[in-house]
């Protein structure tokens, strides 16, 4: 017998069925999308190096060249190649972590190299522990850490780079501990290599904080590389004798520095001069290195009970003629690296701060503090003992604190595992926990940046939810590589915005409740709190773009439109006004990716094109009325004419600020003047006006890209300088006479009224603002010269 359901029961059951269907559908959908991390067999915490190594291993196994009989080989390889292309890129990795593959619709990729490339050219130095592969985000911090770096800029396809690789590996092992050996893959980091002036491969440079980079021009043998490197190593070896021995020892001991002395006698072996120099460089600032010739200093050696060649380390305060020699370390090795490790292992540990004096000590000095729980884990890395010396000039003291002696103190600082933090001289109120690599150069960079920045570690007690001052808060997880990459940029941004905005970081693995309260679903999520207003940052991980975001919050470059204001400002715009409008929906991932680019574009078009956006989730009916069928929908509204309602839709693949700007400028009426051979001669060469000329060819792609930029320049300098264009395909002879050898070429022709002659100057910049600034500077110089000439008359 059937059972009749009431209307309410029917609706309730129908909702349940629909919900179950949706759950099953989503499970199937999720199951079909393979996780990029799983594809490569790495964890979400994997470093760039680990991702490269995992991809290379898979590439050599799955490449279509090695699987010619597998019809699925191409498709399978595309999947892992796509995963690698996304995860190796910091910005794409952040998008993927936050939105999944939907957030990558503008970055499709799809190309890969041959099997031989992955076997022989890919990740040349990833398996060499002595060589550190540096990426753009960490390069400056590394080479400015205070250590000496020798960096190899190479390209994977360069045969000379591969010829050098075995020598570079041997060289790195030879000088390990003496200086840092780095490598930069210019195939992956083209921008970094261009910024460093690298235009040939391999290029080898010495870097040290406070000095200009030095390029190596010698032959590429290990011996020549070692010789060149040693020229830049700070090494002083003192010959000790009766006249200077006592004073040298006492002066060093008074400064807390010990001596490593090799005694050379007839019997046994003492260290060679080359080994002594290397040890001096390796122990620079930690231990003085000296030698004594016992053949000429026989009495002094006997007084020290030295009867044969030997090497000994005398720590500060050691009794030199103590026959028990309990405090003196005698070394049996003749190898510089072995001696270095033994000496540095015997150096005293950092000062242990007590719970009783901690607050007072941190209130009067800047500190880098290691937190440990009972056993000091840092003693496993003797290299870290260099920190005290390398941070001395920055007035940063280095110490340690045992959390097992006062658990409450560490708990209040949210320190629950061995870690280190910088305290900025204000007690325990202002501090920042280190989340980077536990290696010397990374800790040095962190300490120097942190003490001079204005970023603080946040928790429930100091979270600025209701603070009257605006705050930028970075919600992050320490295991997330894009999060760690963002932290140095936040420090830079905090200095640029000091006094306008406070900066803090919140570790969501420690403060899960706070992160859930603000619905943090991906890391890093950066939010600006301005009393009741909350704004999420969606831009790239750079201090400059964070600065742009804050400036845009204070002075918005994009008009938020409503149906009413759209009608008033866009539909009924003035005759000479133009608009670009973004129709978007907040839930749409491509819209979210577009928004920071849209704002960046708007700032560059101020005064030329009005830029707006309209929320189609809030104003759904209006967007439907405007026939908006997809998001984001970008439209250009040209100057009003007698024609019906008119606009142009953007159909380009790239939605970055540059591409959109070029597209919008292309609709503006031309301000520059097209010149013929006759008008070029009459108006430019024989006239009395300043001119800037774009020499171009219609078939030239870069010329087409530059054309809107030149029109923007023409508008920026209108009234001061005339702008003209010469078609070098139509008027080849004119361009030849003007000395044009490439397209586009920009030249500034300026008229010197005092001499009644024209001068010309080639401009090798392609940015309208930069060209305008250069021209204005030149005009000011000409004006000042004119004034001086009048004064002289």
UniProtKB/Swiss-Prot annotation:
GO terms for molecular function: misfolded protein binding; oxidoreductase activity, acting on a sulfur group of donors, disulfide as acceptor; protein-disulfide reductase activity. Residues 348-463 are annotated as: Trxb 2. One of its GO terms (biological process) is IRE1-mediated unfolded protein response. PROSITE patterns: DNAJ_2 (PS50076), ER_TARGET (PS00014), THIOREDOXIN_1 (PS00194), THIOREDOXIN_2 (PS51352). A motif (Prevents secretion from ER) lies at residues 790-793. Keywords: Disulfide bond, Endoplasmic reticulum, Glycoprotein, Oxidoreductase, Redox-active center, Repeat, Signal. Its EC number is 1.8.4.-. Residues 1-32 form the signal peptide. This is DnaJ homolog subfamily C member 10. The lineage of its organism: Eukaryota, Metazoa, Chordata, Craniata, Vertebrata.
